[in-house]
A protein has these predicted regions:
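Structured-RNA-binding interfaces characteristic of tRNA pseudouridine synthases
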Residues: 2-288
Length: 288
């Protein structure tokens, strides 16, 4: 009796520079991360049907990722054909072959067989983003400028932090989200913090760290855009409180440009818990 699985679920850990992509999601006639990866998979995985990717975070146009995660199901027969003459195992061979055909602005950092029940989107417990800003009109280092927003006004870290504290917690973020049919806008925003770095790759940049269980469409950039208006003195805390409590998306909130934003990390529970987490997440979020 053949007990081999019909498909093998594979986890891909990815990084990409989003500058020249129209976002993650496949779109006709546009260069997207998903479309580029799936085209590479079609070349590497010789299967009758094209493997489809499920991703942890569907990044918008221009948004980058250092720690993106996706999964796909590969037919078992095609999976067994992957090892090369260099005697790599299937996962190592898949990553190496993909990186050989992918453009320079995407890299597969690792490929691995996913634990039972793993879902890149629904098993995740947290996403962490960073938004990088060079304020007061100062030009950022040319080596990082594609990932940094040049902001014309000076920012006050104390004002940014005070404004952000009022937004964290489990709440309805409809004022900061582009509505999608049947999708909830209730999220648990665990951190929205700001710091001015003094050393390292981000030296002299203002960096926002944003963590939540998940984010709805344009939520991170809307949060950043709203808080920036307080941090540069154009708005006050009362204004932010009013727009945050709006029952629908507020036109008063300027969405921050995509190129300053990077998906840094996606967090998952232990292998034994990923299936349970996926089942829980598929249930609609409520405030109860």
């Amino acid at each position: 009796m053949n007990d081999s699985p019909i498909v093998v679920r594979v986890r891909l850990d990815l990084s990409y520079d989003g500058t020249d992509f129209a976002g993650w999601a496949d779109q006709p006639a546009l260069r997207t991360v998903q479309g580029t990866l799936e085209a590479a998979l079609a070349r590497v995985v010789r299967a009758e049907s094209l493997p489809r990717l499920v991703v942890a975070g569907r990044t918008d146009a221009g948004v980058h990722a250092r720690g993106q995660v996706a999964h796909l199901d590969i037919p078992h027969a095609a999976w067994r054909r992957l090892p090369s003459r260099f005697r790599r195992d299937e996962a190592e061979s898949l990553a190496a072959r993909l990186n050989a055909v992918l453009p320079s602005d995407i890299i597969v950092r690792a490929a691995s067989v996913a634990p039972p029940g793993f879902d890149a989107r629904f098993s995740a417990t947290e996403r962490r983003y960073a938004y990088r800003i060079s304020d007061a009109g100062l030009s950022p280092d040319p080596l990082v400028r594609r990932h940094v927003l040049t902001y014309p006004r000076a920012l006050d870290i104390g004002s940014l932090e005070a404004a952000s504290r009022s937004l964290t917690g489990l709440r309805d973020f409809c004022a900061f989200c582009r509505p999608r049919e049947g999708a909830t806008t209730i999220r648990d925003l665990r951190e929205l913090s700001w710091r001015r770095e003094v050393s390292g790759a981000d030296a002299w940049l203002v960096v926002a760290t944003v963590r939540a269980d998940a984010f709805c469409h344009s939520m991170v950039r809307s949060l950043v855009g709203a808080v920036l208006a307080v941090g540069d003195g154009r708005r006050d805390a009362e204004w932010l409180s009013r727009v945050a409590s709006s029952p629908k998306r507020s036109p008063a909130i300027a969405v921050a440009p995509g190129h300053g934003l990077t998906l840094e990390q996606v967090v998952y529970p232990s292998d034994a818990e990923v299936a349970r987490r996926a089942a829980e997440t598929r249930g609609r979020r409520t405030l109860n």
